[in-house]
Design a protein with these regions (language model features):
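Histidine-acidic metal/acid-base catalytic patches
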Residues: 29, 82-97, 104-188
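Active-site acidic/histidine proton-transfer and metal-coordination neighborhood
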Residues: 3-4, 9-97, 105, 175
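A broad structural signal for short, well-ordered beta-strand segments within beta-sheet-rich domains
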Residues: 1-3, 123
């Protein structure tokens, strides 16, 4: 069993908090630290987060660690011409990555494949979560509306190293749901 990504809470971190994260992730052999949420509502919010992420990534880099951001739907709101996710990605250093959750990209009304291609080379991790026809999450992969063959193909072409099957609630017993989703991916 190997660790290849940790969600390490909100930014910014104090030096002591960041040092503890560095120590833990080095012990785990995990190179990828992910900010799983930020309350972005405006372009200025996204620009402030980009600045914080650039500063944090610079502190992680000497340890061989990289910083990323995990999206939800609110990052795809527009402030002006651009989505907040685009503002964030376009104002962070290139080694800062997106951990796209394809459910939330689609839920926000965007094509996950387009976003995967747009930020090729900047997404070593990807969350695969299905979108049901009625826009619910938490259904097994292959039972909803997302084209996982195209998503995984685009992810591989974009340099994704690890595809993470994500499901937060289970209509079936959890292990049955996990098996159904894994089987759906393996059939692709």
């Amino acid at each position: 069993l190997a660790a290849y990504g940790t969600h390490f809470g909100a930014l910014p971190k104090t030096d002591a908090e960041l040092d503890a994260q560095i120590e833990m992730n080095l012990a785990l052999g995990n190179p990828y630290l992910v900010c799983p949420w930020h309350d972005m509502k405006t372009r200025d919010d996204a620009l402030r987060l980009a600045e914080i992420m650039n500063e944090t990534a610079a502190k992680l880099k000497p340890h061989g660690l990289r910083l990323g951001y995990h999206n939800h739907a609110h990052e795809f709101a527009k402030d002006g011409e651009d989505t907040l996710m685009d503002v964030l990605m376009e104002n962070t250093e290139k080694e800062i990555f997106a951990e796209f959750d394809v459910f939330w990209v689609a839920y926000a009304g965007y094509d996950p494949v387009e976003y995967i291609r747009k930020y090729a080379g900047r997404q070593p991790l990807m969350h695969l979560k299905e979108l049901a026809a009625d826009h619910r999450a938490n259904v097994e992969l292959g039972t909803g509306v997302l084209d996982f063959a195209a998503i995984i193909r685009a992810g591989r072409e974009a340099g994704v190293e690890h595809f993470i099957i994500e499901q937060e609630e289970y209509p079936l017993p959890p292990l049955e749901s996990c098996k159904a989703s894994l089987d759906a991916v393996l059939r692709l």
